[in-house]
């Protein structure tokens, strides 16, 4: 045996802590890589949309009566004279530095506009998903527990309406009934006009900002304006969550362990909520996450009907004004939020369900 072999230190395999750290580091690296690739794909899609839409971004800046020299100068300043690959790389670079361009509609940087309008959409969608979860999950459980009953049929009709009733129609009916006729809720907008501008924006969400400022009257006024559009969004979330909860519960109620529990005389309430409902909580997280992301991106018509100053209303105005920087910026933010919520729900799914790890 050589001297090198005698003095060489034995190589010991990593212990349980080292193996756990390596697995977690690999999982985090894979998650970040997937997130980066998905975001890059989103950038490519938004860039492609900006080139496919039959709107000339140069004309939206210089106007229809600009001379050819002014048009060409603006086109060169916007980098549209460069090859498509260079335009895409320039677009990615600007996005990564937070530069989404200037909005023609407002005259402000798009990133500043989005920071103003997104909190309103986030506030409405968050209350909407809370309503959807609070009502949709119990209704889905009850429908499955009483399969075939009149209550099950009624809940299924509600679920069908959530897929067939247009959001703008439901919003208009809600305004006509609960605001114009019954006066139970506030009208369009986030606040009554005499409350507007009385509190300094901190988070951009009026419910939180009014509480931070100690303005209880403004808080309740904001609630009266928020409850109807959030309920309209919550109805569509409720329909989807109730339908999926019912489907998950019916699958669990047909399992052998549920039948065994009933044969042993376990109370029906315990069978429903402990034996059947517990296993579906993890897949419900994915359903709720998808519904939440859908509310954030699908609130455009609701915001237009209720004159809600959110990102959906901002996107609609930008489209009507051919404001491509604002359109692409809003689309990018909505897509990024959708991706982020789906990734978070996927992480929660893996954390709560050991079989998915």
Report the location of each language-model feature.
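An internal, D/E-rich "acidic patch" concept
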Residues: 2-5, 12-24, 59, 81-137
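Cytoplasmic-entry segments and transmembrane alpha-helices of multi-pass inner-membrane transporters
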Residues: 23-32, 139-174, 282
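Alpha-helical transmembrane segments of integral membrane proteins
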Residues: 24-26, 42, 118-151, 198-357
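Transmembrane alpha-helical segments of polytopic membrane transport and secretion proteins
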Residues: 1-35, 147-148, 152, 347-357
């Amino acid at each position: 045996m050589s001297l090198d072999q005698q003095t060489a230190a034995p190589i010991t395999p990593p212990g349980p802590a080292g193996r756990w750290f390596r697995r977690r580091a690999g999982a985090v690296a894979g998650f970040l890589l997937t997130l980066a690739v998905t975001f890059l794909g989103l950038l490519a899609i938004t860039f492609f949309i900006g080139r496919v839409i039959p709107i000339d971004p140069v004309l939206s800046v210089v106007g229809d009566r600009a001379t050819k020299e002014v048009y060409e100068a603006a086109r060169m300043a916007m980098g549209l004279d460069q090859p498509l690959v260079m335009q895409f790389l320039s677009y990615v670079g600007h996005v990564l530095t937070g530069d989404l361009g200037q909005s023609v509609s407002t005259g402000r940087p798009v990133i500043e506009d989005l920071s103003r309008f997104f909190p309103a959409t986030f506030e409405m969608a968050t209350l909407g998903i809370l309503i959807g979860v609070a009502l949709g999950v119990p209704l889905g459980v009850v429908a499955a527990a009483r399969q075939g009953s009149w209550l099950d049929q009624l809940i299924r009709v509600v679920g069908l309406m959530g897929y067939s009733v247009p959001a703008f129609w439901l919003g208009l009916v809600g305004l006509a009934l609960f605001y114009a006729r019954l006066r139970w809720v506030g009208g369009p907008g986030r606040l009554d006009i005499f409350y507007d501008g009385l509190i300094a924006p901190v988070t951009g969400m009026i419910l939180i900002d009014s509480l931070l400022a100690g303005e209880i009257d403004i808080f309740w006024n904001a609630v009266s304006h928020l409850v109807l559009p959030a309920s309209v969004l919550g109805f569509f979330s409720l329909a989807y969550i109730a339908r999926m909860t019912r489907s998950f519960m019916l699958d669990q109620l047909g399992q052998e362990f549920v039948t065994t529990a009933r044969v042993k005389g376990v109370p029906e309430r315990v069978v429903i909520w402990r034996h059947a409902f517990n296993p579906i909580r993890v897949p419900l997280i994915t359903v709720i996450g998808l519904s939440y992301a859908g509310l954030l991106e699908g609130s455009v018509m609701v915001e237009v009907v209720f004159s809600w100053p959110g990102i959906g209303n901002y996107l609609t105005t930008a489209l009507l004004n051919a404001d491509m920087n604002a359109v692409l910026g809003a689309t990018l933010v909505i897509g990024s939020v959708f991706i982020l919520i789906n990734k978070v729900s996927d992480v929660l799914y893996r954390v709560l369900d050991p079989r998915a790890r």
